[in-house]
A protein has these predicted regions:
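Beta-strand/loop-rich accessory regions of lumenal/periplasmic or secreted enzymes
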Residues: 1-286
Length: 286
């Protein structure tokens, strides 16, 4: 078992290249480097790369199912239900270890509700970010969202304007040293559009759209052509690999960027993420 959803197919188009997993790391910013945030919280990069899925539960119309062979060999391709809930329990490899619960609820209208809970433990360092990472097989052509204008972070959104915006360029902000960018706070919905399914060189005539929408509270997201680890490993822009995938992170907590100076001043207290607390949020895929 991969420890997550292995496929999301909509109108014949595959939207997953890898199983969605909890994400705990963003690429360092200049301010993060200046305060040596990676020394204090670098264990979250390892937790982001390697996570242990300890349990999976499948509930169909209120009844617990046996999800492993040979018990699940009774199912055929025409099995249907009014509601299916798939629950994953993860443990981080941090010391001490934290627990993350991710629940997918699929209903007859085709929507997938995603509920995410992080249960912190005393002694863990501050988190850079907490959310779910979805890696798509090909590059998105664009995305549209309802939320705040431009790139926003918890401590960088006072001048943003609420509205509907479209972004056609998924490339990174061209900093001298590649770093985290492209976050959008307080988002009501997001539509990612592609003309490709599994191969960037094979474009279709029909535009395909995957929508993420809020359920209770607005969410934050970034939609980039690289993972945080790929950005982290590049010291100059030209060292980044060719862009081939779409990396969508739907976040429930985001650390601020600071910027008072870049040689020692930390992010202000209200914009930090205490990893000892509980973080919960939800969104829907449709």
């Amino acid at each position: 078992a991969q420890g997550g959803l292995e496929s999301i197919v909509k109108n014949g188009y595959e939207w997953l290249y890898r199983c969605p997993k909890p994400t705990f790391w963003r690429a360092l910013t200049d301010n993060d480097r200046g305060i040596k945030f990676h020394i204090k919280s670098g264990s979250w990069m390892a937790a982001d790369t390697f996570i242990d899925c300890q349990n999976v539960e499948v509930i169909m119309d209120g009844e617990m199912q046996k999800q492993y062979a040979p018990d699940n060999n009774i199912y055929e391709g025409d099995v249907s239900a009014d509601e299916i809930i798939v629950k994953f329990t993860y443990k981080t490899i941090s010391n001490p270890s934290a627990t993350v619960l991710v629940s997918y609820t699929v209903t007859g209208n085709g929507k997938i509700r995603v509920d995410v809970e992080y249960h912190g433990v005393k002694g863990l360092p501050e988190l850079p970010v907490f959310g779910m990472r979805f890696i798509m097989p090909t590059l998105a052509d664009s995305y549209m969202y309802e939320g705040l204008s431009g790139e926003t972070y918890p401590d960088r959104k006072a001048g943003a304007v609420k509205g509907v915006y479209q972004v056609s360029d998924l490339s990174l902000t061209p900093y001298l040293v590649p770093q985290d960018c492209g976050m959008h706070m307080d988002t009501d919905w997001l539509e990612v559009t592609r003309y490709t399914s599994l191969d960037n060189s094979r474009r279709d005539y029909f535009l395909q759209i995957l929508k993420i929408e809020k359920t209770d509270e607005p969410f934050a997201f970034s939609c980039l052509p690289y993972t945080a680890e790929e950005i982290e490993n590049a010291t100059h822009y030209e060292e980044l690999p060719p862009a081939r995938r779409t990396v969508l992170c739907v976040c429930g907590a985001v650390r601020g960027v600071g910027g008072i100076d870049s040689w020692g001043s930390d992010v202000e207290e209200p914009y930090r993420i205490n990893a000892e607390n509980v973080i919960s949020y939800s969104f829907a895929i449709c």
